[in-house]
Swiss-Prot record:
Database matches in Gene3D superfamilies: Mediator complex, subunit Med21
Keywords recorded for this protein, A-Z: Activator, Nucleus, Transcription, Transcription regulation
UniProt protein name: Mediator of RNA polymerase II transcription subunit 21
InterPro entries: Med7/Med21-like, Mediator_Med21
Bilayer-spanning residue ranges: none
Length: 144
């Protein structure tokens, strides 16, 4: 996962892309402007362009990206965060890390104990099968 600044940069780049796409699509689909001095022939048979739908779509995308940017900015550490607050936060994270490490060590220990039990049971099963097979072979041999 990227850090907050990289996420913020990606969101700003995405917002810029959305603005460029919105302007391009609206320019392409928008109705032609009429100039009083210039006579232009407009094809009346052209189908109506869904510019309103595009406008709503791009407005929603831009608004959502702007909200994402606000959330990312709010998640950045503030200037009010003093060294003491940062040290306390770091200490808390270290405690959580030690607790997680202890829990992991306990789980690994229990896993090793289960592995030993399983290996012992498998060895007993293999030994029993060998005894059964050797007993079956000795009984099946004809007496000569």
């Amino acid at each position: 996962m990227a850090d907050r600044l990289t996420q913020l940069q990606d969101a700003v780049n995405s917002l810029a892309d959305q603005f460029c796409n919105a302007i391009g699509v609206l320019q392409q689909c928008g109705p032609p402007a009429s100039f009083s001095n210039i006579q232009t022939a407009i094809n009346k048979d052209q189908p109506a362009n869904p510019t309103e739908e595009y406008a709503q779509l791009f407005a929603a995308l831009i608004a959502r990206t702007a909200k994402d940017i606000d959330v990312l900015i709010d998640s950045l550490p503030s200037e009010e965060s003093t060294a003491a607050l940062q040290a306390a936060s770091l200490y808390k994270l270290e405690e959580e890390n030690h607790e997680a490490a202890t829990s992991l060590e306990d789980v690994v220990y229990r896993g090793d104990m289960l592995l030993e039990k399983i290996q012992s049971a498998l060895a007993d099963i293999a030994q029993s099968q060998l005894k059964t097979r050797s007993g079956t072979h000795s009984q099946s041999l004809p007496d000569s």
